[in-house]
Amino acid sequence: MAMAKALLFAILGCLCLCSAVLAARELSDDAAMAARHERWMAQYGRVYRDDAEKARRFEVFKANVAFIESFNAGNHNFWLGVNQFADLTNDEFRWMKTNKGFIPSTTRVPTGFRYENVNIDALPATVDWRTKGAVTPIKDQGQCGCCWAFSAVAAMEGIVKLSTGKLISLSEQELVDCDVHGEDQGCEGGLMDDAFKFIIKNGGLTTESNYPYAAADDKCKSVSNSVASIKGYEDVPANNEAALMKAVANQPVSVAVDGGDMTFQFYKGGVMTGSCGTDLDHGIVAIGYGKASDGTKYWLLKNSWGTTWGENGFLRMEKDISDKRGMCGLAMEPSYPTA
């Protein structure tokens, strides 16, 4: 009996010790995560209105870090990272970054497609318009839902470089403030085709430096010094990655994607593969294509969320997938300006 009691006490003692160790470890982990959150806040200049908001955001941050680390522990072609969206739930991210961004077209008027007869077998295996000086540095749209303007401007910057030899950073804010009499509504969303229509009617755009980005809607400023123009625009045949390849081989192309998934929210690098939606809500730019070291074919894309997102602001998504709409719907509504 005495031995049995001694054994019971020993077991209870071990259990209490284990519980204490686990509790201490959890406290230590929480303290380390809190310190990480503080460093993240300092990095991104995040300030909360009170302690309650900070505590709530810390819990969201902690859950997102757990998701990122769990995903990265799996077998994937790409990986995620803790970025500027780490204290946002996915619902908040969708509302802030994608729900007010690209507005899918309800009726697309048929246009010509000048690359229809291009021999796809004669196209280069790899294209990267950055190496040709046709891509300006990564920009950041902030909390304004005007991805459509950044996409249209980036495509225009590309064709202007290819037609004139000059790479000019053009003004997204001019579109945000002045292109408001149709589908495009500044920070509330728009679409690239309508942006191209406005640019044509407006006689072009001025420079970024002459009409700086403000990340907010403002009154249209009268500017008469447009420095670059386009003659028209064309839509790439929908749901056709081969046609999109023909276009991208010749110039940067505006595309729309479903950017609301958590893997898109925290994308850090590699070739994005797997399932994703096709509810188009975000405008970006296809600036090339290629093949990864493991043989996965990809599209190279420029985003407008700053350099801390993705591969220094850029993204690679799997190319030529079985779904004709393309990865995240990128082949559904591509278009490009003409010069």
UniProtKB/Swiss-Prot annotation:
EC number of this enzyme: 3.4.22.-
Pfam family, one: Inhibitor_I29
Keywords attached to this entry: Disulfide bond, Hydrolase, Protease, Signal, Thiol protease, Vacuole
GO CC list: extracellular space; lysosome; senescence-associated vacuole
Subcellular location: Vacuole
Tissues where the protein occurs: Low expression in mature leaves.
GO molecular function: cysteine-type endopeptidase activity
Biotechnological relevance of this protein: The senescence specific expression can be use to monitor cytokinin synthases (e.g. IPT) in order to promote yield and early maturation of panicles, and to delay senescence.
Disulfide bonds: 144-187, 178-220, 276-328
GO biological process, one term: programmed cell death involved in cell development
Active site positions, chain numbering: 147, 282, 303
Signal sequence range: 1-23
Induction: Accumulates progressively during senescence with maximum levels at late senescence stages. Induced by abscisic acid (ABA), ethylene (ACC) and gibberellin (GA(3)).
PANTHER family in UniProt: CYSTEINE PROTEASE FAMILY C1-RELATED
Function: Cysteine protease that may have a developmental senescence specific cell death function during apoptosis, heavy metal detoxification, and hypersensitive response.
Similarity comment: family membership: Belongs to the peptidase C1 family.
Protein name: Senescence-specific cysteine protease SAG39
Gene source species: Oryza sativa subsp. japonica
